[in-house]
């Protein structure tokens, strides 16, 4: 969107930047005008101009971005970015299902069985902010392609934040951006279901290695389409002169890895926390995180996570809520799968069928969100999501021995898709709209880092709960104890969303963060100029 030329106007004030743009279009400010309009005419003119600006903003929020020369170019871009969600969820969900087969074939000890599932989320969580900064430095295009071409663990850490960055940069606030982010959430659901479907087929009929060959083929196809259709923003991003905070990045990555490792491994060492290296690594990790906070807050010129990002209304509370919500989801997916197979006796393909409501419900909810986000307050959707986060693990925590699928598992699947799909799109749209284009990589890194860190921490803590109670309570009760922990995280998340989510309104068409900042600067300039002229007279 090109902003209207902001003419010097003596009546402009810095208090309302929108007035500056409106007054700049007022015919009364034209020096060639031969007659000064009356007061009533001014009111009428300014009302018409305001309506026309609102109409223009609404139109721009619905139009295809000018960077795409055709609809096919836009569709190619959308497909390429949405595939990042499919690839990530494919490896998250399917790996949980294929894990029992993998443990048996590779003879992985029970004490180490949680690591294959935890390591993926841990690596992504620890490095997302780093790759988000690389996206802001070098552009989403090269970092996105790098993630698709590289390792399974580090790859999503590269293409997840830059995927959000590309959408947030290309699309301005409005229904079209809401639709793309809704599709982004929908493809996460499709990837989730496709992952467990492929894992079920592979685990039951052919060798488990084919699961990874399928993932590699999908990544290759996405790499080709991305190279063709994703806009190359390298030159534009390099103009921002953003640099990497390497000391802060190193301390953050090492600190997160050591803390999560100590928490997770403590459940399987012979003496638990009395094993010398467990508290040692935990303390070293905490010290490194404190060092990272010091570097980020007082040393680094361009910190990975600037403190002023949390000055955005309710940013801190929503970040914590997102951490708790995805920890809740991680527990449900891993221990729900183990409960279905080991306690309820479901085969891999039966588990696929049992998770069908998650896929169908997610697709339906995300399609509805595309048409409701600019009409329904985001706060209401967050409250519904919080209720789902409490209800889904609660049902599995209460299911009796021999409980049926339709009475317990089916409604829990419906509730879990409500919690994840409603919250993700709302928070993504809110955060990317609040931040300027130079920080879209940061937005993507923060969102996905918090999500994956929530999963890694929650799985580590729930593994402690399950391991410490299995001998006394039995396998079934130990699984249900993890679901009670998920109920606690869901309840805390709900409280945060109810109280602080009120700041999240409707995702209507609006000026971008960059345009708002430009108007505020122009308003301040006009106000300063007006005071100088008054003082001179």
Q: Predicted segments — roles?
A:
Residues 2-90, 104, 527-534:
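Cytosolic juxtamembrane N-terminal segment immediately preceding the first transmembrane helix
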Residues 79-83, 90, 95-100, 107, ...:
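Transmembrane core module of solute transporters
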Residues 102-103, 134-135, 198-206, 263, ...:
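Interfacial helix-cap and linker-helix signal at transmembrane-aqueous boundaries
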Residues 110-111, 174-184, 348-349, 435-447:
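Loop-to-transmembrane helix entry/capping segments in MFS-fold secondary transporters
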Residues 118-133, 160-164, 356-369:
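Central cavity-lining transmembrane alpha-helices of secondary-active solute carriers
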Residues 128-130, 134-247:
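Helix-loop-helix hairpins in multi-pass membrane proteins, especially solute transporters
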Residues 206-320:
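Hydrophobic transmembrane-helix bundles of small-molecule transporters
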Residues 434-471:
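A late C-terminal transmembrane helix in Major Facilitator Superfamily
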């Amino acid at each position: 969107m090109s902003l209207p030329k902001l003419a010097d106007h003596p009546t402009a004030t810095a208090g309302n930047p929108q007035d500056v743009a409106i007054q700049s279009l007022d015919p009364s400010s034209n020096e060639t005008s031969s007659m000064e309009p009356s007061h009533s005419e001014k009111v009428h003119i300014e009302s018409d101009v305001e309506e026309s600006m609102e109409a223009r903003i609404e139109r721009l929020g619905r139009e295809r971005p000018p960077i795409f020369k055709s609809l096919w170019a836009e569709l190619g871009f959308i497909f390429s970015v949405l595939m990042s969600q499919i690839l990530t969820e494919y490896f998250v969900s399917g790996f949980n299902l294929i894990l029992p087969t993998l443990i048996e074939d590779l003879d992985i000890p029970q004490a180490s069985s949680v690591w294959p599932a935890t390591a993926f989320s841990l690596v992504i969580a620890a490095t997302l902010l780093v790759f988000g900064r690389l996206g802001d430095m070098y552009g989403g295009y090269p970092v996105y392609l790098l993630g698709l071409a590289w390792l399974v663990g580090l790859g999503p850490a590269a293409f997840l934040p830059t995927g959000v960055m590309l959408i947030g940069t290309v699309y301005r606030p409005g229904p079209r951006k809401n639709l793309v982010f809704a599709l982004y959430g929908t493809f996460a659901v499709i990837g989730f279901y496709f992952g467990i479907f492929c894992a079920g087929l592979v685990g039951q009929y052919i060798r488990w290695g084919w699961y990874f060959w399928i993932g590699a083929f999908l990544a290759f196809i996405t790499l080709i389409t991305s190279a063709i259709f994703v806009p190359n923003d390298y030159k534009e991003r390099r103009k921002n002169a953003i640099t990497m905070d390497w000391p802060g990045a190193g301390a953050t990555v090492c600190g997160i890895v050591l803390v999560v490792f100590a928490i997770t491994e403590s459940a399987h060492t012979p003496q638990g926390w009395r094993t010398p290296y467990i508290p040692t690594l935990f303390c070293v990790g905490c010290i490194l995180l404190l060092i990272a906070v010091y570097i980020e807050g007082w040393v680094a010129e361009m910190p990975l996570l600037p403190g002023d990002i949390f000055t955005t209304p309710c940013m801190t509370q929503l970040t914590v809520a997102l951490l708790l919500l995805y920890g809740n989801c991680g527990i449900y997916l891993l221990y729900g799968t183990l409960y279905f197979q080991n306690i309820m006796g479901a085969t891999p393909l039966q588990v696929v069928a049992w998770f069908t409501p998650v896929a169908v419900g997610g697709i339906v909810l995300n399609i509805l969100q595309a048409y409701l986000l600019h009409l329904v307050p985001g706060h209401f959707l967050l409250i519904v999501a919080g209720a789902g986060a409490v209800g889904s693990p609660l049902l599995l925590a209460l299911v009796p021995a021999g409980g049926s699928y339709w009475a317990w598992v089916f409604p829990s699947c419906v509730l879990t898709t409500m919690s994840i799909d409603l919250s993700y799109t709302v928070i993504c749209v809110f955060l990317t709209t609040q931040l300027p284009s130079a920080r879209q990589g940061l937005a993507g890194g923060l969102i996905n880092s918090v999500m994956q860190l929530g999963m890694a921490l929650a799985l580590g803590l729930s593994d402690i709960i399950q391991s410490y109670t299995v001998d006394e309570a039995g396998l079934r009760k130990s699984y249900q104890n993890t679901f009670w922990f998920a109920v606690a995280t869901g309840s805390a998340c709900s409280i945060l969303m109810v109280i602080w989510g009120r700041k999240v309104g409707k995702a209507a068409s609006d000026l971008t963060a960059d345009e708002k900042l430009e108007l505020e600067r122009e308003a301040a300039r006009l106000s300063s100029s007006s005071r100088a002229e008054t003082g001179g007279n």
